[in-house]
């Protein structure tokens, strides 16, 4: 109740506060210490500022270092200083720290060592678990510490009932209930008053308990004390003990049994004063089998089946709440008693102290009456939801009385369905306890993001919990309109705004009502709405990009974990026979598997969020496209209002700028304004609306547009944009346009190729809003001005006939994907590269960007030009040799080298003139090497002498260094042609002299020397008539060849 219990009250007083919850007792070894218990309603899992207050007077049961597994992320283990005090486990950063990191109330937790199913690979690990709540994992440094902690925490978590107290009908806390402090909102920590202070009177406390849910504070069982029995039960809590006032008619809880005599209401050691009866396990409806007035001193004993039924009832209510929050239909039938009290009674137990402050404005759905998804309906088309009627019936059947406030229903002033109703929250709702609600929603969000492995996860469509959604029906985040009163004066004041929103939400209704169809040309732009819509689109694009980045990061982490697990499996196969190594590998594998599971959960959630954001982005994008099409429709009407046309044109450019920027920032998405802007350049043409054209305006409506045009309206161009209509407006009034029907297949075949060519030519030239140069329309087959009365502003904006309409606009389903600006520029650069010779052979594109209005034949596909680096040099050499005047054929270097090698192997087949060999070699022209010729001047005597000296010096060096290398070449032929040693020495000197002469001549003149062919057969070359047995028989060809290749 709301009255503050005394901090230290005499042990002789009685307490007649309703007792609906479990109690605890002091161990027998401490009879002199007043019994205390932990607060049931701590908040946010007791983290930091929301943690429970530690009673400084309570003795410390156990303290020490433990490793605690983190609650989020990769589940890392943090070393913390744990202190077990008064059945509550507090932990700090170290033993000297005073600020509490967190608190865990251990009452009715189950503390035990970890099992293999827990997938915990750390040694000396134990857990404290509670069904339906997060399981805490701790790790000690030794097995002894582990056992000591398990025993101490188990003692603190055990509910002890002395035999003498078992006859008292107390509601026993069920072991499967949620005691965790993370799931409850914060409360003001009340200071304990002195023991002699008087609390508030009982009726006032009862009234307040009716209002805010703090009406049933739990009493505790105490061990029997002799002094308690001797005290006369005259007063309770300092007030005369008398009959309690009966429960009010509107109270959700009947009057319950009182605390037996001898029990006292204890002070809360950790500052929590209030206890809610609305938790599913708190048994808000206990049996009233005792006396109804006076002092409640004795009660019939509760039988064991009563306790079992009590536990079962608590568990059923808990399961119903879990199923309700997760969208799972409950297993009970419609006759279950839980259907006959208001759904606000099943408000989750986290909000017990505050449940009655919100008098049933926002209700959860009763089991089985949860409506279908509302994201597909506009807000003004929804009928009365069936769950609202069910709520009313449940409330009146249960006798909710004045505590239940009916919803208010309002008829919106809409132009659509007049029977649509919109739900509006009650104005009398009191927006209080926002800080508690924030903490509660954050704790709920953490709980929903970390479901236990055996439970069903929350539906992704339910979104996250926020302050406005705690007591409101669960909605899909993709719902475009919230269940709020519509802004009728804003949405429906402008007929054009009604047309846009109506056609986007429900395309089945005709977009142009009869009332406004003739007045569309008076459409005045609302810049604020356009700015708001474009801002939402940009914001949603940023959200999509961030979520996509997160998904990519999680995928990379998942792949790395999977690769690490694969390596671990391979190591287990390789080193499985070793004694200690497999155990470490198994621990490593278990840890990696746990991390992989967590990463997969996060990846699934991130992928679902990305999908929802993408759908929302596409909705916004289609709305912007529809707005763009509306503006283009308005611009193409035959209105004479120049100011309005300029304003509409500015709005079109604003939309195009945003869409172009989004497409450039995120090219992977198809965020292109091609579906609602004109093709670049002269290809942005639109068909005529004349009766002669088979492609009427209705047939050319883009399927991406939410409009389906009605008769009498103008053609809706699917690609407006990039051509300024005002410049075309004046021109089109002067020039009548030709309207040619698309009757022949030849004309249809011209469309796609012409679009590609024109788009390529204009891609890098035109920007958004820049009008390309215009040309005169064709003069043949002129039409009368009366035939183009309705087309003077919306017709052929570039002077082109309807047969040149892009294929992507005529047949939207068959058009190929439009190239981006970067791809078009890259393609233009590739076309401009290449050699000039191949450009002359290819098709010559006109340099002028001005289009030719007359029909031209379709272009052939231009082959990509090769760059200079890709041209084969052999082809150039062949072309140069073919174009050489005189028809002389020259050897390539490869042919010449092959010929010289052949001569080296078979020198006896050639008849070589020795005089030619000793003379100065002739100079030849090598055109492919581009060597300039010099006049052949004979050497002076001084130069000849100098040359002879050099030859002598080099000759001795070469003879010493290369004789032993050349001797073994032709040893097999020495028997056939025997020669004397003198002739061999002369021949050797000649070869050395010729070789040295060729080398010095090449180095001195700086150009290449070669022997010119005398006949078409292989030309004469220095070759020895001597047999190969000559040690230097092949020296001269090698020298000539080396001097040749050295200069290449």
Curated annotation (Swiss-Prot):
Location of Phosphoserine modifications: 247, 251, 314, 459, 461, 472, 591, 777, 801, 848, 854, 867, 940, 1017, 1021, 1024
Bias (Pro residues): 1016-1030
The UniProt record lists the keyword Isomerase: no
Taxonomy, superkingdom: Eukaryota
UniProt KW keywords: Phosphoprotein
Compositionally biased region (Basic residues): 828-842
Occurrences of domain PH (ranges): 59-158
Matches recorded under SMART domains: PH
Region Disordered, residue ranges: 1-36, 165-318, 448-467, 663-746, 793-858, 968-989, 1005-1048
Composition-biased stretches (Polar residues): 1-22, 267-290, 456-465, 712-721, 794-803
Modification type Phosphotyrosine: residues: 492
Composition-biased stretches (Low complexity): 687-711
Basic and acidic residues: bias regions: 201-233, 815-827
Annotated positions of the Phosphothreonine modification: 744, 784, 920, 1015, 1020
Summary of the tissues where the protein is detected: Highly expressed in heart, kidney and throughout the brain.
InterPro entries documented for this protein: PH-like_dom_sf, PH_domain, PKHA4-7_PH
CDD domains with a match to the protein in the record: PH_PEPP1_2_3 (cd13248)
Protein name: Pleckstrin homology domain-containing family A member 6
Native source species: Homo sapiens (Human)
Lineage: Eukaryota, Metazoa, Chordata, Craniata, Vertebrata
Gene responsible for this protein: PLEKHA6
